């Protein structure tokens, strides 16, 4: 019931966040990122590479009242693993919390859900962005995410 619905909601939010990341690389993804109330802004984004796996970690903060929830603040901490040795990406962990920092989704962690990242797919675009030689050095890309996400959601409202 309720917990399953929250998992679904957070997964939907995760896809939107990663769509925003992808829209930094391929502008046509911008249109997919517009779902008001899902997340107000991206608080941080980081890349960490271990061998062939790149972990993209993102934290979003939103005002869930706009989306019909009771909490005043909603923080979602999530990660996506990109396997540069194959065509797979996975959204791996998601934890949501309220303003006090208390976890509101019972410490929600997911097992990696791998799906194929084809050339034109969201995962494929992110994979190209982080797996290309030198991609990890493109720090300005990460620095721009916060302003870019805020602008996307401002336009969406």
Where are these regions (language model features)?
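N-terminal secretory-pathway/extracellular module detecting exported/lumenal segments
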Residues: 1-157
């Amino acid at each position: 019931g309720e917990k399953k619905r929250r998992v679904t909601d957070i997964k939907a939010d995760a896809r939107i966040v990663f769509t925003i990341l992808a829209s930094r690389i391929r502008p046509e993804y911008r249109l997919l990122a517009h779902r008001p109330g899902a997340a107000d802004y991206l608080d941080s984004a980081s890349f960490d590479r271990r061998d062939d796996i790149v972990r993209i970690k993102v934290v979003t903060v939103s005002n869930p009242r706009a989306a019909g929830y009771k909490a005043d603040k909603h923080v979602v901490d999530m990660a996506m693993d990109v396997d540069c040795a194959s065509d797979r990406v996975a959204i791996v962990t998601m934890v949501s919390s309220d303003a006090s920092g208390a976890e509101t989704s019972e410490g929600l962690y997911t097992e990696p859900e791998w799906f194929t990242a084809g050339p034109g797919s969201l995962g494929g675009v992110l994979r190209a962005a982080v797996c290309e030689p030198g991609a990890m050095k493109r720090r300005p890309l990460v620095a721009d995410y916060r302003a870019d996400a805020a602008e996307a959601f401002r336009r969406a409202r």
